[in-house]
């Protein structure tokens, strides 16, 4: 069944910035997808096409991307008469229409919106759920399905919040839960106790939340953040059952080969900046003191040697995000140089569902884990909930248990777990090996 109509429009993400929504019509009806956007974006990501007209939307308009869907991609898809279930063929057609290595002509935000819409339409044509369709595309096992461990970003710093805290995300992971539903309850309880502690220690405004729903108190150091998180976990009685993860996002504070943990201070003293080896020592001190099971982006996106040196010294999950940008060439290099052991997969970093699936399988084939991720500028579209189940990744991060654009993904996972019943398992402590369960 081919596509009969393609239409894009401007809608708004969770930060109030314009983004692209795409609708596709087939004989089965109308299907819709909305594209997210990031705040701390890697320089190697596919291009999110923005208008750049400072007089409208502060330069963040997406009218060019919308027009590219309506005037170039849509007509080409309809003319091609490609069946909606030909995901790879449709994605390859759009990549060919763009003709660049980073989707800078048409925009990854234009191409991805169509790609995700096509998957929804194809699942409907086949009469199966979206996660089952994605599993078919990825040639992933479906017996049983794996429900992921949620890594809740409960405390925000870095580019996602005000205050002086350099590191961007402090996450909790209910690995000791017996189900996703229980993980949600545990996460909710810890999050609310953390909010209470933040207000008690830093004042009423400390309960205000950042872009991803986590509290954003005016904290100075990672130790201050981790002490408060561990206290909240212990208050709930979940010691040993709820672990911790960190996303440093250090590319924003990488300067002249060193790392400036005081980068938010306008007159930061260069003598206090850390060398890669000193930063490694700092990470090791945190790993010894706190129940940390996952470190994302410990080093900057092109500091390859520091990544590979650090991986040899730890036995926790090391996630590559800005380093790899869901890009198969960079993933291959990271695998070859032994820089990490887990891929963070973001759909809009690469721009099509087909390439995202290929990136996940590339990581799995190397023995890596894969974590599915939202973006800081999110929408109500829950596509990544189906993606993480379809790919058997075993882990997802979609912010805190706050803000509806974050809960849209978690609530969809609750529905999927309930629907599957005995035909699914919760990844739990084996979150890194979801594809092997």
Swiss-Prot record:
Keywords for the protein's UniProt record, in alphabetical order: Glycolysis, Lyase, Magnesium, Metal-binding
GO cellular component: phosphopyruvate hydratase complex
Catalytic activity: (2R)-2-phosphoglycerate = phosphoenolpyruvate + H2O
GO MF annotation list: magnesium ion binding; phosphopyruvate hydratase activity
Keyword Metal-binding in annotation: yes
Active-site residues annotated for this sequence: 212, 346
TM spans (from-to): none
Superkingdom of this protein's organism: Eukaryota
Cofactor: Mg(2+)
Pathways involved: Carbohydrate degradation; glycolysis; pyruvate from D-glyceraldehyde 3-phosphate: step 4/5
EC number: 4.2.1.11
InterPro entries: Enolase, Enolase-like_C_sf, Enolase-like_N, Enolase_C, Enolase_CS, Enolase_N
Binding site for substrate: 160, 169, 296, 321, 373-376, 397
Example GO BP: glycolytic process
Keyword Transmembrane helix tagged: no
Classification via Pfam families: Enolase_C (PF00113), Enolase_N (PF03952)
Record-listed Mg(2+) binding positions: 247, 296, 321
Family indicated by similarity: Belongs to the enolase family.
Name of protein: Enolase-related protein 1
């Amino acid at each position: 069944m081919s596509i009969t109509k393609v239409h894009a429009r401007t809608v708004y993400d969770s930060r109030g910035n314009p983004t692209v929504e795409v609708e596709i019509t087939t004989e089965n009806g109308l299907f819709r997808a909305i594209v997210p956007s990031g705040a701390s974006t890697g320089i190697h990501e596919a291009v999110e096409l923005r208008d750049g007209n400072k007089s409208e939307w502060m330069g963040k308009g997406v009218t060019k991307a919308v027009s590219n869907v309506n005037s170039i991609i849509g007509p080409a898809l309809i003319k091609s008469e490609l069946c909606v279930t030909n995901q790879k063929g449709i994605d390859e057609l759009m990549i060919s229409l763009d003709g660049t290595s980073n989707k800078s002509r048409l925009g990854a935000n234009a191409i991805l919106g169509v790609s995700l819409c096509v998957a929804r339409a194809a699942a409907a044509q086949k009469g199966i759920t979206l996660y089952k369709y994605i599993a078919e595309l990825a040639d992933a096992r479906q017996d049983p399905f794996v429900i992921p461990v949620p890594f809740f970003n409960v405390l925000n710093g870095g580019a996602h919040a005000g205050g002086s805290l350099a590191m961007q995300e402090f996450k909790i992971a209910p690995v000791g839960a017996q189900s996703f539903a229980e993980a949600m309850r545990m996460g909710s309880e810890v999050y609310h106790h953390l909010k209470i502690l933040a207000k008690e220690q830093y004042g009423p405004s400390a309960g205000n939340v950042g872009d991803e729903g986590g509290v954003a108190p005016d904290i100075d150091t990672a130790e201050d953040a981790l002490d408060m998180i561990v206290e909240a976990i212990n208050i709930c009685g979940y010691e040993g059952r709820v672990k911790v993860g960190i996303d440093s996002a250090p590319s924003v504070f990488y300067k002249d080969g060193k790392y400036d943990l005081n980068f938010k201070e306008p007159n930061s003293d260069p003598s206090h900046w850390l060398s890669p080896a000193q930063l490694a020592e700092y990470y090791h001190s945190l790993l010894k003191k706190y129940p940390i099971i996952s470190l994302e982006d410990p080093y900057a996106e092109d500091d390859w040697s520091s990544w590979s040196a650090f991986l040899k010294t730890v036995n926790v999950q090391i996630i590559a995000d800005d380093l790899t940008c869901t890009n198969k060439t960079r993933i291959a290099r990271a695998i070859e140089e032994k820089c990490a052991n887990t891929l963070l997969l973001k759909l809009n970093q690469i721009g099509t569902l087909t390439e995202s699936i290929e990136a996940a399988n590339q990581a799995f084939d190397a023995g890596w884990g894969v974590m599915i991720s939202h973006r800081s500028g999110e929408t109500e579209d829950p596509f990544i909930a189906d993606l993480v189940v379809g790919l058997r990744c075993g882990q997802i991060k979609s912010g805190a248990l706050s803000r509806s654009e974050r809960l849209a993904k978690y609530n969809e996972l609750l529905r999927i777990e309930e629907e599957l019943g005995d035909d699914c398992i919760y990844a739990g402590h084996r979150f890194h090996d979801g594809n092997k369960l």
